[in-house]
Amino acid sequence: MSATAEQNARNPKGKGGFARTVSQRKRKRLFLIGGALAVLAVAVGLMLTAFNQDIRFFRTPADLTEQDMTSGARFRLGGLVEEGSVSRTGSELRFTVTDTIKTVKVVFEGIPPDLFREGQGVVAEGRFGSDGLFRADNVLAKHDENYVPKDLANSLKKKGVWEGK
């Protein structure tokens, strides 16, 4: 007896074999789609976690909150290097960033950019230390006399403390 004849003998209506096969295909397809969606969800979750850890929010001294100063979160601090505030001790550079409303003391360990100087725009990347000082691990200075980072320029213009381009 052939396989089809055996199926028909067990299932006189002849539907069982075909119906089971279609049902199994649908179930298999649903599992594949569900698995692909689960993998996609995990990938998106990992990407968002990585982006969240790498995002560095921009703040001026007047924008800072108590949470910014105590959370240990990394962000970018922007403003102008206050006149008379720069001091060097070995490889440590200390200076004050201001937006003319508030000031923040910054400590940077390393060599500052060539164009770093008092009265110029600066963006420092880092976090606040337990001592209340902003610990920068990267300092960016303007690269010509007309350049101020766009975020910094917009923020300073909103506060009415800068009138540049």
Curated annotation (Swiss-Prot):
What Gene Ontology terms describe where this protein resides (cellular component)?
plasma membrane
Sorted alphabetically, the Gene Ontology BP terms of this entry are: cytochrome complex assembly
InterPro entries registered for this protein in UniProt: CcmE, CcmE-like_sf, NA-bd_OB-fold
GO molecular function term, any single one: heme binding
* Encoding gene per record: ccmE
Lineage top rank: taxon: Bacteria
Classify the protein's membrane topology as the record does: Single-pass type II membrane protein
* NCBIfam families attached to this UniProt entry: PRK13254.1-1, PRK13254.1-4, PRK13254.1-5
In its UniProt entry, what is this protein called?
Cytochrome c-type biogenesis protein CcmE
Q: Which family does it belong to?
A: Belongs to the CcmE/CycJ family.
List residues in topological domain: Periplasmic: 51-165
Q: Topological domain, Cytoplasmic: which ranges?
A: 1-29
Localisation per UniProt entry: Cell inner membrane
Which residues does the record give as heme binding sites? H143, Y147
Keywords (alphabetical) are: Cell inner membrane, Cell membrane, Cytochrome c-type biogenesis, Heme, Iron, Membrane, Metal-binding, Signal-anchor, Transmembrane, Transmembrane helix
Species = Brucella canis (strain ATCC 23365 / NCTC 10854 / RM-666)
